[in-house]
Amino acid sequence: MAPLLSQTLIHTGRFLLRRFLEPPPAVISAVAASRVCFHRYYSSKSLSLVSPLGLHCSSLFSPPALCNSAFSSSATSTTIEVQSTEHEVVIALGSNIGNRMNNFREALRLMKRGGICVTRHSCLYETAPVHVTDQPRFLNAAVRGVTKLGPHELLSVLKTIERDMGRKDGIRYGPRPLDLDILFYGKMRISSDKLIIPHERLWERSFVLAPLVDLLGSAVDNDTVAHWHSLAIHPGGIFQAWERLGGESLIGQDGIQRVLPIGDKLWDFSNKTHVMGILNLTPDSFSDGGKFQSIDSAVSRVRSMISEGADIIDIGAQSTRPMASRISSQEELDRLLPVLEAVRGMPEMEEKLISVDTFNSEVASEAISNGADILNDVSAGTLDPNMHKVVAESGVPYMAMHMRGDPCTMQNKENLQYDDVCKDVASELYLRVRDAELSGIPAWRVMIDPGIGFSKSVDHNLDIIMDLPKIREEMAKRSIAVSHAPILVGPSRKRFLGDICGRPEATDRDAATVASVTAGILGGANIIRVHNVRHNADAAKVCDAMLRRRRSKG
C-alpha cells in the first residue's frame, strides 16, 4: 500500500500545489460579493420584494406551522396590543450564565409563544466579554423573524422573557443568563427613553455584527433589508461595517469563534479537519458489507479507527449504495441499537462523537435517544417527511446531504442532468436546509454534504471536489449563515475513483481516496468521511499544516 500511496501522491502533488497553494486560497469572500450586490440593488429603479427562499412575493414568507402563536399575549398572561401589519425584526441573543445553549432554546420557545415568528437563525459564536472582562465567555447569536407586536410591546415581551429566564438587575455589561436586544424593527428608526433602533452600539460590536451578517444573503433579499443597510454608519451598509471591524479575519481568534453545539460542548470545525470513520453494519455495502455485523467485530473496528485518528464514528445500518433495497425500521434498529449501545460505552469514545447514518425518522429518534450525537441524513429529509421534525425536537446537529431520488433511482439519467453541478447542488441543498430551518432546526445546528457519488457522474464528482468554494458562494447569495456551515466530503472508495484509476475493487481505492480528500480539504472541507482512517487522517494533518502555514504568511 505504501508504494501505491507514494506513487499516487507524487502524480497528484504538483497539480494540487499549483491548484491550491500558489494563488491565494479559494476561500469565500461573501462579504465582498455582498457589497457589489448592495450597490447594484440601490442603483436599481425598482426594488423587488423577495422572500428568504428567493421567490418574488407580496409579503414576507410566514410559514403557518411556525407562526400560529396567539399574538395577543406575551410569554406571560399579560395582554399585549398588536398591530395589524407584520414587521420583520432582528433580535440579538447573548448568554454567559448557566447552560447557555439551553438558555437560547428556551428563549426561542418563549419568543414563539409571545408572538414572534422566527424565520432565520445566525451561526453561533463564543465570544470574550467586553467592558467587564472578569466573567465567563458569552454565547452570541441573532434571529430574524416577523411579529405583529409594536416595537415597545416587543421590547416588553423580550424583557419578560429575560426575567422569566432568571435575569436580574446587576452590573451593567455583567454576567447574565439571557440578553435579548432588538437590532432592527421593520423600516423604523426609533429613539425613546426605553428603546433605540437601530441598537446604539450595533456598529462597534463584532459579537453583534457577525451574527447579524449571517442573517442576510449576499444578494439583498427584500426592501426591508435594504433599509437596514441604509441605516448603517458606513455607505457600504452592514457588510462594510462588518469589514471595517475586521470581518472574517476576526473569526477563529480568541475574541470570537464560530462554533457548533454538540451535546454539552461547543465544537469549532475551522481549526482542524475532523475525520469521520465509517462503520457499516450492513451485509450489502459496496466496500465492506458483512464485515462488522457482530457487536465484537464492530467494537474492534471502532477501537482501531479511534487509534488511527478518527474524531467521529459514523454508524449506518441501512445501505445507501446504488440500487440498495430499503429495509424495515425494525430491521435497521435491530442492527443498529446493540452496536450503538456498545460503542457509546467504550472508554475510547470519550471526547469522540457518534453519528448515525439514516434517512428514517423512526430510526433517527431511537438512535438519538440511545446516544447518537449527530444525525446524518443522505436525503436531507426528502425520503421521510417527519425527519426534520424529529431532529428539530432532539436538539442534535443535522448533516444534510444532496441527493436526487433515492438509492434505487439516484443514478437514473434524469437525476444526472445539471446546468452547473456546483450551483445546482448548492441551490437544491439550500432549499432542503431552509426547509429544515423552518421546521425548527437552527442554522447553527446544520452541516452540509454535497453528496459525492449520489446522483453524480464522474465529472460531477470531480467538479464538486475541486470547487467547494463555489458551493459556499452560491449558498451565501441566499444565506451567509448556511454558507458558513461545516462541509463534509465523502469520496471514500467510491466507484468514480475506480473508474478513473482502473480499480474495480473498492478496497483498492484508498490511494485515490487520499488524493481526492486532499483536494477537498485544501478547497475548504471541514470533515472527511472515510473507510481507511489512518492514511486519510495523515493526509488531513498535512493539509491542515499547509493551510496554517499559508495563513501565517498572510
UniProtKB/Swiss-Prot annotation:
It catalyses: 6-hydroxymethyl-7,8-dihydropterin + ATP = (7,8-dihydropterin-6-yl)methyl diphosphate + AMP + H(+); (7,8-dihydropterin-6-yl)methyl diphosphate + 4-aminobenzoate = 7,8-dihydropteroate + diphosphate. Residues 90-215 are annotated as: HPPK. It is found in: Mitochondrion. One of its GO terms (biological process) is tetrahydrofolate biosynthetic process. Its EC number is 2.7.6.3, 2.5.1.15. GO terms for cellular component: mitochondrion; plasma membrane. Mg(2+) binds at residue 280. Disulfide bonds: none annotated. Residues 273-541 form the Pterin-binding domain. Residues 275-554 are annotated as: DHPS. NCBIfam families: DHPS, folK. This is Folate synthesis bifunctional protein, mitochondrial. The lineage of its organism: Eukaryota, Viridiplantae, Streptophyta, Embryophyta, Tracheophyta. The gene is MitHPPK/DHPS.
